[in-house]
């Protein structure tokens, strides 16, 4: 796809950097906000390049999202962003731009490049010249040098022919200026969130209206001094989502003694998982919970959450999910059940969910399958048990069987994972997705 070729007057640009009770210390959020935070956390998770993050990206792609990933590298920074898009109803398109957090050595160097530089200018050349000034004081807008370097390299370093010999940042800003009804959302986790905030400030300096700039960050540190905060807090709409015990959100205030936060603050509390409170998987878990808690299961799926299911001849009859979980995990069973159901609904159509409320024999399931006109019967059993001598680390397992209309076994498989790098609900969805490749070989 040619870069941003689908952007038009009637489209929406959403620029932003995996369904689970909300532990929120802030005011209640609306269903629309929960949907946006959930989508932003998914895309922010997919912006990283590790195995689990790539799986999230693949899941989004199979659900109808397209990733256009860009990378500009020089000795200063490895500037990266992902433009994530999909088509909605009514010939509208939605765009997310995700900035990854720290995952490379050069990213860590960026984080610790804490010298303050002047932030200003109206062109990429002026941006660079202002940051090079050595004579400055607190009355000027000053920002974290490393974060500023990152955005300069990622968005404003390299003019390209496909952008009319302009940088990606200039091109995007012009699209927004020419289409003032379009909305721009920016997001990311940690370094990615800081990058999203500075990118919004740059777009503001390029003439983009404040109401077009919506920023959502997860565990992001402050990026600038008091002057910067007061100058730009009305030039964008910033929502900062943090975990209560996340140390990164305030680390720069301690290191520099002069950086301040601004914007709307939402605080989520991690009172279950004993891991570093800055992990993106925790932010994803809480945003998933918020989404499910504000969207009743019987309501239609919001447009951005809808998948593009594969059309099957006859469809799949899904038996009731079976769970055998340790007591610590049982409170999450409703969220697991809904997440697993919605994941299958996004993957296949038609999908018929069993009306049985309890375990039934295969013969009874096949009888109901035939009555429903389905071609396949899918059985999935899930277990979750604490690993011996490992506090709050669980072994999650899924056993899956796929049968035809006569009750003949087509395939069976077992997948497992621990919760070392995932929350229990995320692990269940991960196991189901891991089984998809083998399952699909037998579906027509």
Task: Describe each model-derived feature in a short phrase.
Residues 359-410, 416-417:
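Surface-exposed short loop/turn segments
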Residues 303-314, 387-390, 403-444:
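C-terminal/domain-edge helix-coil "capping" segments
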Residues 225-308:
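Lipolytic serine-hydrolase domain surface
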Residues 341-367:
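Short beta-strand->alpha-helix linker/helix-N-cap micro-motif
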């Amino acid at each position: 796809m040619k870069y941003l070729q689908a952007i038009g007057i009637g489209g929406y640009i959403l620029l932003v950097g995996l369904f689970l009770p909300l532990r929120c210390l802030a005011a209640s959020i609306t269903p629309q906000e929960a949907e946006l935070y959930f989508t932003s956390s998914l895309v922010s998770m997919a912006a990283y390049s590790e195995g689990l993050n790539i799986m999230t990206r693949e899941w989004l792609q199979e659900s109808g999202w397209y990733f256009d990933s860009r990378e500009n590298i020089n000795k200063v920074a490895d500037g990266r962003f992902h433009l994530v898009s999909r088509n909605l109803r009514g010939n509208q398109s939605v765009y997310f731009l995700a900035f990854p957090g720290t995952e490379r050595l050069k990213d860590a160097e960026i984080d610790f490049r804490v010298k303050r530089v002047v932030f200003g200018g109206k062109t990429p050349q002026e941006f660079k010249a202002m940051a090079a000034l050595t004579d400055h004081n607190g009355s000027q807008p000053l920002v974290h040098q490393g974060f500023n370097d990152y955005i300069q390299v990622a968005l404003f370093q390299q003019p390209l022919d496909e952008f009319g010999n302009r940088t990606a940042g200039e091109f995007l800003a012009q699209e927004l200026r020419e289409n003032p009804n379009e909305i721009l959302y920016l997001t990311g986790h940690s370094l990615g969130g800081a990058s999203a905030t500075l990118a919004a400030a740059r777009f503001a300096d390029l003439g983009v209206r404040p109401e077009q700039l919506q920023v959502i960050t997860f565990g992001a540190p402050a990026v600038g001094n008091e002057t910067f905060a007061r100058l730009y807090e009305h030039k964008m709409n910033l929502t900062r989502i943090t975990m209560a015990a996340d140390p990164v959100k305030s680390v720069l205030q301690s290191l520099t003694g002069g950086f301040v936060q601004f914007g709307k603050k939402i605080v989520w509390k991690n009172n279950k998982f004993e891991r570093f409170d800055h992990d993106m998987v925790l932010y994803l878990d809480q945003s998933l919970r918020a989404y499910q808690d504000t969207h009743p299961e019987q309501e239609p799926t919001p447009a951005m959450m809808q998948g593009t299911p594969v059309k099957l001849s006859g469809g799949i009859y899904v038996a009731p999910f079976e769970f055998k979980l340790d007591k610590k995990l049982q409170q999450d069973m409703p969220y697991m059940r809904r997440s697993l159901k919605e994941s299958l609904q996004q993957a296949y159509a038609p999908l018929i969910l069993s009306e049985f409320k309890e375990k039934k024999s295969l013969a009874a399931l096949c009888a109901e399958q035939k009555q429903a006109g389905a071609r396949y019967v899918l059985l999935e059993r899930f277990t979750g048990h604490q690993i011996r001598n490992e506090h709050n680390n669980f072994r999650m397992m899924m056993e899956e069987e796929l049968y035809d209309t006569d009750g003949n076994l087509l395939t069976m498989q077992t997948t497992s994972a621990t919760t070392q790098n995932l929350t229990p609900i995320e692990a269940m969805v991960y196991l189901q997705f891991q089984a998809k490749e083998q399952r699909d070989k037998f579906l027509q």
